């Protein structure tokens, strides 16, 4: 099994983050990766806002993950 990892500088604009993630995911798929991991959620923290990760979470049926399916043809 080929595993790919992607990393990028996370912004506060989820749409931009989603576009970058989709691009990285497409690159992994083009190289026949079976699993693609993004560690960014582990880094999404703010010392002044302990709930940032929870507040930033996206629904599985939402636009953020829906964008991946559109860009990479994954459902």
Curated annotation (Swiss-Prot):
Described purpose of this protein according to its UniProt entry: Pseudogene resulting from a nucleotide deletion that introduces a premature stop codon at position 66. This is the N-terminal fragment. The intact protein (AC A0A140NCB4) hydrolyzes deaminated glutathione (dGSH, 2-oxoglutaramate) to alpha-ketoglutarate (alpha-KG) and cysteinylglycine, has less activity against alpha-ketoglutaramate (a-KGM) and no activity on glutathione or L-glutamine. May function as a metabolite repair enzyme.
Protein family: Belongs to the carbon-nitrogen hydrolase superfamily. NIT1/NIT2 family.
Protein name from the UniProt record: Putative protein YbeH
Species annotation: Escherichia coli (strain K12)
Lineage: Bacteria, Pseudomonadati, Pseudomonadota, Gammaproteobacteria, Enterobacterales
């Amino acid at each position: 099994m080929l595993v790919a990892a992607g990393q990028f500088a996370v912004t506060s604009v989820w749409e931009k983050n989603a576009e970058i993630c989709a691009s990285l995911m497409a690159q992994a798929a083009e190289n026949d990766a079976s699993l693609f991991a993004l560690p960014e959620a582990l880094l999404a923290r703010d010392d002044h806002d302990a709930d940032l990760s929870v507040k930033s979470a996206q629904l599985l049926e939402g636009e953020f993950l829906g964008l991946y399916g559109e860009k990479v043809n994954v459902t």
